[in-house]
């Protein structure tokens, strides 16, 4: 009923190869006729040409790891696309009107405020996205963020602060008419 091509890796493929992969999945796996095929990607390695190739092959949902729209927050994370580029790409994807378009947002990022999270959620709604996933920052071994925490260069948000981030995002989503499907 669902196939998830995740981790951002699929968008590293050429459009032709991405289409071949999705076509092979549709042809060789026992999928239901209404099977959702999600393609997770990174904006800097994804373009409308790849999106069209994936959609032509049968992808039905595109999920992008935006994390935050704020350039001040994105830059230290190594995100290559600017706020304007992210917004433009998402608007173009939505305009294709051929798949559900969703994004991942992260709260608890360095320099982020609860209002930043709320603004990101409002921006998603304003773009006409089909949904969003709101995740707490997860400090992963070997990443620059965890290294900064270990060296005392960054303090991670504590439970109360994380709660404030989540509450701001949830309130903004509710104000936009979105309802949570899981917490």
What residue ranges belong to the model's regions?
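C-terminal scaffold of the Radical SAM
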Residues: 1-183
């Amino acid at each position: 009923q669902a196939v998830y091509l995740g981790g951002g890796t699929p968008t590293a493929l050429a459009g032709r190869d991405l289409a071949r992969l999705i076509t092979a999945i549709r042809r060789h796996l026992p999928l239901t006729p209404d099977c959702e095929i999600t393609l997770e990607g990174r904006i800097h390695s994804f373009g409308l040409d790849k999106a069209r190739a994936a959609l032509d092959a049968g992808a039905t949902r595109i999920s992008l790891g935006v994390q935050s729209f704020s350039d001040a927050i994105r830059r230290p994370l190594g995100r290559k696309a600017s706020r304007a580029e992210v917004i433009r790409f998402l608007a173009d994807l939505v305009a294709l009107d051929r798949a559900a378009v969703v994004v991942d947002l992260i709260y608890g990022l360095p320099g982020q405020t609860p209002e930043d999270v709320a603004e990101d959620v409002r921006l998603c709604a304003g773009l006409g996205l089909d949904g969003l996933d709101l995740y707490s920052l997860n400090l992963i071994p070997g990443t620059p963020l965890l290294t900064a925490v270990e060296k005392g260069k960054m303090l991670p948000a504590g439970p109360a602060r994380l709660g404030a981030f989540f509450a701001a995002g949830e309130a903004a989503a509710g104000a936009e008419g979105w309802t949570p499907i899981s917490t």
